[in-house]
């Protein structure tokens, strides 16, 4: 009832505001022309035409990257956040839940507060936010749901953005993902609330972001006996025994973000016109970026599960493990911008970054006196940064190359050089080749240095990790084709072994990847295919599926003089067998296992998507092949099956004037 009331309240905003599309960027292959970072609503209902300009600042303010938006419904039925980011994942079957991409090159960047790395897709952080300039306000409402009482799965996403003045924009966003879980003790929730704003007038540009992410995951330790899933039984999912039968075991997190960026433009202004915008540029600018982040992760047990956890060190009655962290980051840069007249004259910049981290956690435990102490561990680093770039959209050859070297503090000696070069193959830049590369030496995340929990204790002095990565791709938008290859060499790789303890290997880990994406069309039928091939040279520490496939097949057609847009089809997710990681609830991390392989099981979803004016509606049956025999080897993580079949539906509604 509360959710229904919230939906009505937010929907009523359309009586006094207007809306537009922002966060989804996937476009059906026949409608690329509607995808623009500066576009107008196709249904005029106001004397003021609706235009929107959206962008992000790259390299902490060095240059703008225009973010193309769309108003299409393709992919709305695939609303599980992790599968919008990666076509194959190891996860706990629930939405939301911790996850690990099975595609190595798309794995999440390690977060400063490491426990957040495995839930990154459910966080909204400053680097995810878009900046806006709109002629009219807008509101978007998304509500997706499935299951019934006791097994419901819901997503509510509401946001509103508007210009207060032509040069000043502000917005809010609220998202809630919740699930009762199909198996016992799987209740989960992830939600965030965000405020953001941007200001650009004459020589001054400002952007502001403030939000908080929260989450709660009940832990069940996976199913106790995999035969309940693999063999034919009539046992309902909610009655299948699990390893942690108590309903008072959970992981909880909180992440708070603040960012303020200021830019001051220097020199004589010059007006520049592009196909999508007209703007003013200056020869140079000075930038300051201030970021603060607060984190907390808490693991709780009301009663100790001695038969599941091999060790209990501190308290034999209950568990409360807590880690907190604060990150402060200040960066300054001086930028010489690209010259608007001489297209191939690059921009350059240099600056200083200062980063400070403070961890508070249990630091010692005396097993004889059973006393414990808590303390602070502090890390800091001062970095020199520099870069060169030419990202002018009117030239055929573009690049962005940056370097960062820590000269003072705990991270002294760490460095990172990364960038890309891209060459257009056609005058309209509809096809191109691109190469990306990264060389990095990074100290091991503090999470691996020391941890003292009720079930897990370690103290390590690991070497810094050196990473060399490169990939290249060929993209042809006219043929709807992408082909790519990549290689990653990692020296002193850190992982969790079969006992869920962190280890560092002396072997060089190499991962080879190749992929292809091809969208075929036959009349109104579309067949969008994505496939990844992978090979790890150290299968004993990193197992990956050799082949992963996402097949998106559908029929789409406009009816009733374009009043109704219809799309119906089937999605197939598949990967070959491999040793998928298992999951340890007490540290909220995935770890190696070599007891059994998972995979070689296609998951099929059938769907119907409809667009009626500005409302997108979908109905789908997820995991429909489960109905054929109600069993099978449909595990994701080693002890965690994916959900049985479920009917889901939802609506996405944009309000304009």
PLM regions with names:
Residues 9-18:
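Hydrophobic h-region of N-terminal signal peptides that target proteins for export
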Residues 4, 136, 248-303, 318-657:
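Exposed, low-structure sequence patches enriched in small/polar residues
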Residues 224, 232-235, 310, 366-374:
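Solvent-exposed loop segments that connect transmembrane elements
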Residues 2-8:
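Sec-dependent signal peptide recognition
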């Amino acid at each position: 009832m509360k959710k229904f009331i919230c939906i009505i309240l937010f929907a009523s905003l359309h009586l006094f505001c207007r809306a537009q599309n922002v966060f989804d960027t996937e476009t059906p292959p026949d409608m690329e022309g509607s995808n623009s970072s500066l576009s107008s609503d196709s249904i005029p209902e106001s004397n003021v035409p609706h235009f929107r300009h959206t962008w992000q600042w790259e390299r902490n303010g060095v240059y703008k990257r225009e973010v193309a938006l769309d108003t299409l419904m393709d992919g709305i039925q695939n609303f599980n956040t992790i599968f919008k980011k990666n076509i194959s994942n190891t996860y706990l079957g629930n939405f939301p839940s911790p996850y690990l991409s099975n595609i190595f090159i798309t794995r999440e960047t390690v977060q400063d507060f490491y426990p957040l790395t495995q839930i990154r897709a459910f966080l909204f952080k400053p680097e995810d936010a878009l900046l806006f300039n709109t002629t009219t306000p807008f509101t978007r409402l998304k509500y997706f749901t499935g299951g019934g009482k006791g097994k419901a799965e819901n997503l509510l996403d509401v946001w509103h953005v508007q210009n207060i003045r032509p040069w000043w924009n502000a917005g809010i966003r609220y998202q809630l993902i919740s699930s009762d879980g199909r198996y016992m003790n799987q209740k989960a929730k992830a939600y965030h609330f965000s405020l953001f704003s941007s200001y650009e007038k004459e020589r001054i540009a400002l952007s502001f972001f403030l939000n908080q992410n929260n989450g709660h995951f009940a832990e069940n330790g996976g199913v106790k006996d995999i035969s309940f899933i693999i063999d034919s039984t009539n046992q309902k999912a909610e009655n299948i025994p699990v390893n942690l039968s108590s309903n008072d075991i959970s992981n909880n997190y909180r992440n708070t973000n603040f960012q303020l960026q200021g830019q001051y433009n220097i020199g004589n202004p010059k007006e520049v016109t592009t196909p999508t915008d007209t703007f003013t540029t200056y020869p140079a600018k000075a930038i300051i970026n201030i970021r603060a982040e607060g984190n907390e992760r808490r693991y709780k047990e009301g009663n100790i599960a001695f038969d599941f956890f091999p060790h209990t060190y501190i308290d034999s009655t209950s568990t409360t493990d807590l880690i907190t962290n604060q990150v402060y980051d200040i960066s300054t840069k001086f930028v010489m911008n690209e010259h608007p007249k001489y297209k191939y004259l690059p921009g350059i910049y240099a600056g200083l970054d200062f980063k400070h981290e403070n961890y508070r956690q249990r630091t010692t435990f005396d097993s004889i006196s059973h006393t414990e102490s808590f303390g602070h561990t502090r890390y800091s680093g001062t970095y020199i940064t520099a870069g060169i770039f030419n990202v002018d959209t009117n030239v055929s050859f573009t690049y962005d190359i940056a370097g960062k070297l820590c000269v003072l503090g705990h991270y002294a000696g760490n460095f990172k050089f990364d960038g890309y070069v891209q060459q257009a193959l056609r005058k309209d830049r509809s096809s191109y080749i691109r190469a990306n590369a990264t060389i990095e030496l990074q100290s091991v995340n503090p999470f691996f240095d020391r941890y003292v929990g009720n079930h897990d204790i370690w103290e390590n002095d690991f070497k810094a990790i050196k990473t060399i990565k490169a990939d290249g791709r060929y993209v042809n938008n006219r043929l709807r084709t992408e082909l790519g290859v990549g290689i990653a060499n990692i020296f002193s790789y850190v992982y969790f072994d079969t006992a869920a303890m962190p280890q560092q290997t002396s072997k060089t880990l190499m991962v080879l990847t190749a992929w292809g994406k091809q969208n075929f069309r036959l009349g109104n039928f579309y067949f969008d295919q994505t496939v990844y091939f992978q090979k790890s040279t150290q299968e004993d520490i990193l197992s990956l599926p050799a082949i992963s496939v996402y097949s998106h097949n559908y029929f789409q057609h406009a009816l009733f003089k374009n009043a109704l847009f219809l799309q119906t089809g089937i999605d197939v997710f598949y990967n070959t067998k491999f040793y998928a990681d298992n999951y340890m609830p007490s540290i909220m991390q995935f770890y190696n296992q070599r007891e059994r392989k998972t995979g070689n099981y296609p998951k099929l979803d059938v769907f119907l998507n409809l667009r009626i004016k500005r409302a997108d509606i979908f109905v789908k049956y997820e995991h429909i092949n489960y109905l054929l025999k109600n069993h099978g080897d449909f595990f994701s993580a080693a002890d965690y099956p994916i959900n049985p079949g479920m009917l889901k539906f939802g609506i996405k509604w944009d309000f304009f004037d």
